[in-house]
Amino acid sequence: MKPFTTDQQSPAGSPESAAFDAVPGDGTTAPAKGRYARILELAGPAFFSVAFLARLPLAMLTIGALTLVTSITGSYAQGGFAAGAVGIGSAVGGPALGYLADRIGQRPVLLGAAVANPLLIIGTILTAAQLPGGGPLAAVLAAAFGMGATGPQVGPLARVRWMAMTSKDRTGKELGTALSYESMADELSFVLGPALVGLLAAAVAPWLPLALAAVLSASMVSAFAFHRSAAVVLPAPRRTKNTLPEPEDTVQRGGTSWGLLALPVLGMVAMGTFFGATQASLAAFGGTFGAADAAGLLYSIMGISSAVAALSVAFWPRRFSQSARWAVSAAAMTAAALLLLLPSGIPGMLAVLFLLGIPVGPTMVSIFGIGAELAPRHLMGTFMTLLASGTVAGTAVGSGLAGPLAEAFGHPAAFLVSAGAAASLLVLGIASAAAVRRAKNQTA
C-alpha cells in the first residue's frame, strides 16, 4: 500500500471531492480486485480492528446505563430515563464534536473525547451506586448526559475518512462498499456491545460493562486518533477551494435545501427510536422469564442478520437508488416489527428478531448514503455525526417511551413503539424519494 499524500485534488464521484487535499495513492489506476479487498488496501488492515474496537464504547453506553440503573433500582422507568439521558447528551455533543473535527481536525477532538468520556463513565457508575442509599437520580442523569455528550464519534468520522480515501473512484463503487462496511461495523458493534453488557452484567456485576467501555474509550479511541488515516482529512481552513463536477446521479449540493437534509436526520432519529424501544421492550420481555439482564443477548440476534444484510448492499444494482432502497427496506421493517407482538417464548422471539434484522442493515446503509450525497462538503463531519447522533437521540426517545409502557402495561405495549418507529421510517423514506427526485428534476 502506498503512503498517503497531500498534494492531490479529489476527483469527481466523491461526496467530498472539494473538501479534502489528502488522498491515498499516487494517481495510478488500481488493478481490478474485489470491492472489499480494495477498501482493505486503501485503509490498511489495522484501520478495521482499531476503528471497530474504538466504536464499541458508544454501543455500550445506552444499554449499559439502562442495565445498571434498572439492576440497582428495579425500575424499568428509571433505567429508561438514564438511557435517555445518554441519548440526549449524544444528540447535543455528537454534532458539536463533528463540527470541531471539521474545523480543527479529527485527532485533537478524538483525543479530548478519549480523556473526558472515561471520566464521565466512572462518574455515572459512582453516582448510580449511591441510589440504594437515597442518592439523587438527578446526579446519575447528569453524569449519563455527560457520558453521552463526550461519546467518541468513531463511526461518523471513519465515514468521513472513507470519503477522502475513495475520492479517486469516479464510479462511486468504492465509497458505496466502504459505507456498506461501516454500517456492518456499526451493526456488529451494536451486537457485541449489548451482548457484552448482558454477559458481564449477568455473570459478574452490572457496573462492569460501563467500566470496560471506559477502558476501551481511553485506549482504542486514542489509537484511532493516531491512525495514519486521520491525516487524510484536513480541517476546513486548510481545504482546497477547487471544485469538480458531481456524479451525474447526485443532487447538486449547492441547491440542496435544509428541508431535504433534515429527512435523513429524521430517518436516523426514527431508526434510533426503533432501537431504543426494542432494547427496553426486550428487557421487559426477558424479565417475564427472570432474565431482564439478557436483553442485550436477545437484541444481538437482530444485529447479526442486520450486519450481514448491510454487507450485501455493496452489490445491489446502482439503478436501485438510495431513496428507493430506504423506502423498500423500511416497508419490510414495518411488516416484520409487527411480528414482535406474537412470540410468547424466547425461541419464537429469537426467530422474529433474526427476521427483523434483515431489512435494518440496508435501511441504515441507504440513509447514510443519502446523507453522503447531500451533505455540504465543508460540514461533512458535522452532518455524519448529526446522523449518528440522531440514532442515539432516537434511542433515548424509544427507551423513554417504551420503558414506562413496559412497566405499566407489559412488553406488548412497549413493542408498539418499535412498530411505530418502523412505520415512521417508511413514511420518511417515501418522502425522501419524492424530495430527491424533485431536487434532481430542478437541477437537471
Language-model features: where?
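Helix-loop boundary and gating motifs at the non-cytosolic
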Residues: G25-A91, V251, G255-S300
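Cytoplasmic helix-loop-helix junction between adjacent transmembrane helices
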Residues: A143-L188
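A late C-terminal transmembrane helix in Major Facilitator Superfamily
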Residues: H378-F409
